[in-house]
Amino acid sequence: MNISISKTKCMTIAKDPLRCKLVVEDNPIEQVMQFRYLGVDISSTHDPVKDLRSQINKASALSGSLRDIVWSNPYMRKDSKVRIYKTCIRPIMTYGMEVREDTVKTKHMLRVAEMKTLRTIGGKTKRDRVRNTDIREQCGIQDIVRWGRQRKRQWYNHVRRMDENRLPRIVLENNPPGSRPPGRPPKRWKDSWQSTSQEEMQRQLQN
């Protein structure tokens, strides 16, 4: 494998910062705390709020540039505006959502960012005091968190169908040794979408 040493970075993911020294042909590889991969910021501390905020900022910037051209255009049909939102805006906010754990904070951030665009599409503001559920119903849009939960479930089913020697399948079914630290544990990926009905579905798949 050939790599570009000037473009290659190394990063460790751990609770406490770790020093990682890699040398390729007498050239040290720079260690970083954060880097961008396919438009997504990945940090060594794995802060889901920080990573998601970067995606939302990009989606908001694009949505703002379309405000006068598309969202507030009285000559464009609402369903066309919604189709543009689904195609151009939502994928930016939800990129990698299938493998990211959700917290109360990240769910709130996604819903706020989505409703900001949907209110503009529907020609409403907060002063109109229209419920978010009513605006989503008028636009024919499913709640972004529920939509993401379905994507997680689809990814879970996809990984379960993989061979047992595939890395995603190994990671999904692996239980790391040791115990979790005291206090409230970090949110796990499975905790983001499992509920009573979903756990029942999981048991049926295992059987």
Q: What would you call each of these model-derived segments?
A:
Residues M1-N207:
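Short linear motifs embedded in intrinsically disordered, charge-biased segments
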